């Protein structure tokens, strides 16, 4: 998933694919940026699937630092929904049984 924020107060991501399915442990994690979507931005601005949204987010996050959460089976990551975040690439072993699967839960106040 590319860089985006979500229309929620709290996000919970849970990775459910076993570690033995991972080809490259330097990938498959989650990047959580230190910047959050500004309150005046619309959902389309911070979660749009178009070039205008992409360029706006790219410019806003230009010098932003992020934390990288490494992939780990059965790991839950809890963070603020308006924090920009993205999948840290994906490189799993070949085969349907090795696909990276996660559940994402979005919670309001």
Annotate each PLM feature:
Residues 1-109:
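Catalytic core of non-heme Fe(II) oxygenases with the double-stranded beta-helix
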């Amino acid at each position: 998933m590319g860089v985006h924020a979500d229309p929620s107060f709290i996000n919970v991501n849970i990775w459910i694919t076993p570690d033995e399915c991972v080809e490259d442990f330097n990938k498959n994690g989650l990047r959580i940026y230190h910047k959050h979507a500004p309150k005046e931005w619309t959902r389309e601005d911070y979660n749009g699937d178009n070039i205008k949204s992409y360029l706006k987010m790219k410019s806003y996050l230009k010098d932003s630092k992020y934390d990288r959460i490494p992939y780990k089976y059965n790991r839950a990551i809890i963070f603020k929904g308006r924090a920009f975040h993205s999948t840290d690439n994906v490189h799993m072993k070949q085969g349907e049984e090795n696909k990276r699967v996660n559940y994402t839960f979005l919670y309001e106040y």
